[in-house]
């Protein structure tokens, strides 16, 4: 930019003032015309290309990215993973529609579910006219209403955010409904009709019926069963149920040089533990008053539940500092959870009779194997997740299987398919989250799953292959239950 001396500037101003009024008006009109032309050109550019910013249109066959608001890659990656779960989006739609029907609920009380649904719907849409980059700032504002604050430029964890979202949605769902007025006959009649449908009479049964609350929870909600058994008399305690939203799997100790699989992590999770110095009531009754060498016989029990261990690739050094584990764990696109399904005594007898009939008419060598194990048996000796939820969320490190094996899942009742993988690059103190997820399925397609995979890192999106997905070092795995029986696939 040229600079003028102070004397030169003053001289130009004096000459402009000495000119006549007509000359000055003409110059002002010329300047006005130039300014009007520039404004018209700017308006045309705005109409044709929109505002001058980073706003872009979504490419065909892609999904929108998410703007990083300052170390919010953990939130962006989790939202992309949730957007790849069709059953969760359907549940969220029903949940928000029920909230909108309740006139007593304010927008502030339902802000979290509405903000989350709008984001997930946009991230799973096929409309090519939508924005290429979205802003999840509204979800952060909704989370602050639930006493969860994210400081700027502070590292966070995607797994912790997942539990914050699920617990906040449950808190929003479990709020007490309004009390109907005595003269509100329409509401009272509806409540009576709904109660009559749930009324049933049972003369007896091994377990009490499960409350309907289990069926209304979000799709990630599941149950773990456990019980204790004495090693001496084999007396078993009643089955105990624990709820979960995700399974945090630890890496078992494997012989060096051998790969670690997701099935091994699951088996390690449910492996039995021996608890000593616990008195067995049944043995106490049988051995009442009996002494051996002047001492009461010590009875022992064993529990068949493995408590939740530290997952998240976390271990501790000799100095006591946390270290991220780098082992690769193989995971597959399809996962059969039949062997992890808890069966009651009656179900086990029916399953055994059907299995015996199948063995009598088939060669044992031709038995189908899923996940490397016999998938048609229910294991009733250990507590398992019941598999009755449409989506399961497995928290585990992982790497894919490089073996070209053919698995027959035609007999699998609880078959799940991989929908998203979250990967963490970095160490325990800093890093970056990215997501591998399936592209949204076609609206008129027969399958809810698309075969096209995408790599998403905040606002960057590109296509990826299944081999790249299965070769990644996973931090979070999302599996969706399949509803089509008789499926035979190749890994």
Swiss-Prot record:
Keywords assigned by UniProt, alphabetized: Hydrolase, Membrane, Mitochondrion, Mitochondrion outer membrane, Protease, Thiol protease, Transmembrane, Transmembrane helix, Ubl conjugation pathway
Cytoplasmic topological domain residue ranges: 53-491
Mitochondrial intermembrane side: 1-31
Catalytic reactions on record: Thiol-dependent hydrolysis of ester, thioester, amide, peptide and isopeptide bonds formed by the C-terminal Gly of ubiquitin (a 76-residue protein attached to proteins as an intracellular targeting signal)
Membrane spanning stretches: 32-52
Region of interest called Disordered, as start-end residue ranges on this chain: 346-365
Signal peptide: none
Cellular component terms (Gene Ontology): cytosol; mitochondrial outer membrane; mitochondrion; nucleus
Primary location: mitochondrion
Coiled-coil intervals, chain numbering: none
Biased composition range(s): Polar residues: 346-355
Compartment list: Mitochondrion outer membrane
SUPFAM superfamilies the record matches: Cysteine proteinases
Pfam families: UCH
GO BP, sorted A to Z: autophagy of mitochondrion; mitochondrial fusion; protein deubiquitination; protein K11-linked deubiquitination; protein K6-linked deubiquitination; proteolysis; regulation of protein stability
USP domain ranges (all copies): 64-482
Phosphoprotein recorded as keyword: no
GO MF annotations in UniProt: cysteine-type deubiquitinase activity; cysteine-type endopeptidase activity
Active-site residues, Swiss-Prot/TrEMBL: 73 (nucleophile), 432 (proton acceptor)
Task performed by this protein: Deubiquitinating enzyme that acts as a key inhibitor of mitophagy by counteracting the action of parkin (PRKN).
Family label: Belongs to the peptidase C19 family.
Name the UniProt record assigns to this protein: Ubiquitin carboxyl-terminal hydrolase 30
């Amino acid at each position: 930019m040229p600079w003028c001396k102070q004397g030169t500037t003053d001289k130009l101003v004096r000459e402009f003032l000495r000119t006549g009024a007509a000359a000055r008006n003409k110059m002002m009109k010329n300047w006005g015309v130039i300014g009007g032309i520039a404004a018209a050109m700017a308006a045309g550019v705005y109409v044709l290309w929109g505002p001058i910013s980073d706003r872009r249109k979504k490419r065909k066959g892609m999904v929108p990215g998410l703007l990083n608001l300052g170390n919010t890659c953990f939130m962006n990656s989790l939202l992309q993973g949730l957007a790849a779960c069709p059953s969760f989006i359907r549940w969220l739609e029903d949940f928000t529609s029920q909230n909108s029907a309740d006139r007593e609920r304010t927008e502030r009380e339902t802000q979290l579910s509405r903000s989350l649904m709008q984001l997930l719907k946009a991230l799973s849409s096929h409309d090519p006219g939508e924005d290429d980059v979205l802003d999840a700032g509204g979800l952060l504002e909704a989370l602050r209403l639930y006493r969860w604050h994210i400081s700027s430029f502070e590292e966070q964890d995607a797994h912790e955010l997942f539990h914050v979202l699920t617990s906040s949605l449950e808190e929003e769902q479990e709020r007490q409904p309004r009390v109907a007025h005595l003269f509100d006959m329409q509401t009272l009649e509806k409540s009576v009709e709904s109660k009559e449908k749930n009324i049933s009479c049972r003369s007896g049964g091994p377990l009490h019926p499960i409350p309907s609350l289990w069926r209304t929870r979000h799709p990630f909600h599941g149950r773990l069963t456990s019980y204790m058994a004495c090693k001496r008399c084999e007396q078993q305690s009643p089955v105990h149920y624990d709820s979960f939203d995700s399974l945090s799997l630890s890496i078992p100790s494997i012989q060096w040089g051998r790969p670690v699989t997701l099935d091994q992590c699951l088996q390690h999770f449910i492996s039995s533990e021996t608890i000593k110095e616990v008195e067995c009531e049944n043995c106490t009754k049988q051995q009442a008053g009996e002494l051996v060498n002047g001492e009461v016989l010590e009875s022992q029990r064993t529990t068949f539940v493995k408590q939740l261990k530290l997952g998240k690739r976390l271990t501790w050094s000799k100095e006591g500092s946390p270290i991220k584990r780098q082992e690769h764990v193989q995971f597959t696109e399809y996962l059969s959870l039949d062997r992890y399904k808890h069966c009651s005594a009656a179900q086990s007898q029916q399953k055994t009779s059907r299995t015996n009939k199948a063995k009598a008419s088939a060669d044992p060598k031709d038995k189908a194997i899923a996940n490397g194990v016999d998938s048609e048996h229910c294991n009733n000796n250990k507590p398992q997740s019941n598999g009755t939820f449409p989506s399961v969320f497995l928290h585990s490190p992982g790497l894919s299987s490089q073996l070209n094996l053919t698995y027959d899942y035609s007999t699998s009742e609880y078959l799940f398919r991989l929908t998203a993988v979250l990967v963490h690059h970095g160490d325990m103190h800093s890093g970056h989250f990215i997501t591998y997820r399936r592209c949204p399925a076609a609206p008129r397609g027969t399958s809810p799953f698309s075969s096209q995979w995408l790599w998403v890192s905040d606002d960057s999106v590109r296509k990826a292959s299944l081999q790249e997905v299965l070769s990644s070092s996973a931090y979070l795995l999302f599996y969706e239950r399949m509803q089509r029986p008789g499926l035979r696939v190749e890994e």
